[in-house]
UniProtKB/Swiss-Prot annotation:
<dbReference type="InterPro" id="IPR036787">
    <property type="entry name" value="T_IF-3_N_sf"/>
</dbReference>
<dbReference type="GO" id="GO:0005829">
    <property type="term" value="C:cytosol"/>
</dbReference>
<dbReference type="InterPro" id="IPR001288">
    <property type="entry name" value="Translation_initiation_fac_3"/>
</dbReference>
<dbReference type="GO" id="GO:0043022">
    <property type="term" value="F:ribosome binding"/>
</dbReference>
<dbReference type="Pfam" id="PF05198">
    <property type="entry name" value="IF3_N"/>
</dbReference>
<dbReference type="GO" id="GO:0032790">
    <property type="term" value="P:ribosome disassembly"/>
</dbReference>
<dbReference type="GO" id="GO:0003743">
    <property type="term" value="F:translation initiation factor activity"/>
</dbReference>
<dbReference type="Pfam" id="PF00707">
    <property type="entry name" value="IF3_C"/>
</dbReference>
<dbReference type="InterPro" id="IPR019815">
    <property type="entry name" value="Translation_initiation_fac_3_C"/>
</dbReference>
<keyword id="KW-0396">Initiation factor</keyword>
<comment type="subunit">
    <text>Monomer.</text>
</comment>
<keyword id="KW-0648">Protein biosynthesis</keyword>
<dbReference type="InterPro" id="IPR036788">
    <property type="entry name" value="T_IF-3_C_sf"/>
</dbReference>
<protein>
    <recommendedName>
        <fullName>Translation initiation factor IF-3</fullName>
    </recommendedName>
</protein>
<dbReference type="InterPro" id="IPR019813">
    <property type="entry name" value="Translation_initiation_fac3_CS"/>
</dbReference>
<dbReference type="GO" id="GO:0016020">
    <property type="term" value="C:membrane"/>
</dbReference>
<dbReference type="InterPro" id="IPR019814">
    <property type="entry name" value="Translation_initiation_fac_3_N"/>
</dbReference>
Length: 217
């Protein structure tokens, strides 16, 4: 019987970037850190210039003849590229509607679990459908279900705002939450804003009569 093939569980080797001493081309077209052209120079000269500037020599176009390099801060460049990739991924995220289900008699532990689920969905940029399920005669307790949903909205108010208030839908009561776009202004912040607004109100002009001194006897 032929031996079974073994899978290589080692982590894949990442391709190292072509920078500095890893660049092997003898002649390079070099762009300086400010965008100016240094022209076609030798690899050694390009490395010397990058060292003088305390920057990196980065290969940006290997297929050009001769290959094109740019002098830059590679660490900063890599950070900005990763940041742009994350922002692009965030923008491409398709908003979904996630559902959190519960009964109106939910205990505190299960309630905390549902709050945690909703927080994760909201953090991912998704809307949350909060559903209270009624069984049998439980449909008589819609008022308690609405209280529960309002409580959930209050507990999530720092991350979410109500898109649709609690309402009956068949044998369920539902409420929709959407990720909060503007930060919630807390009471202390509101008071501070009010006091600041009061301080910026100009004082009323003094009356002319008050400025005229009373005649001396």
């Amino acid at each position: 019987m032929a031996p079974r093939p073994r899978f290589d569980r080692r982590a894949p080797v990442r391709e190292l970037p072509n920078i500095n001493d890893r660049i092997s081309y003898p002649q390079l077209r070099v762009v300086d850190s400010d965008g100016s052209q240094l022209g076609v120079i030798s690899r050694e000269e390009a490395l010397e210039v990058s060292k003088e500037r305390e920057l990196d020599l980065v290969l940006v176009s290997e297929k050009a003849d001769p290959p094109v390099c740019r002098i830059m801060d590679y660490g900063k460049f890599k950070f900005e590229q990763e940041k742009k990739a994350k922002e692009a991924k965030k923008k491409s995220h398709q908003t979904e509607v996630k559902e959190v289900k519960m009964r109106y008699k939910i205990d505190s532990h299960d309630y905390d679990v549902r709050i945690g689920q909703a927080q994760r969905f909201l953090k991912a940029g998704d809307k949350v459908k909060c559903t209270v399920i009624f069984r049998g005669r439980e449909i008589q307790h819609t008022a308690l279900a609405e209280v529960l949903l309002r409580r959930m909205a209050k507990d999530l108010e720092e991350k979410a705002e109500i898109q649709q208030s609690p309402k009956r839908e068949g044998r369920n009561m539902i409420m929709f939450l959407t990720p909060r776009k503007t930060p919630l202004l807390k009471k202390d912040d509101k008071d501070s804003s009010v006091h600041q607004a009061i301080r910026t109100i100009p004082a009323p002009p003094r009356s002319t009569a008050a400025k005229v001194a009373a005649p001396q006897a």
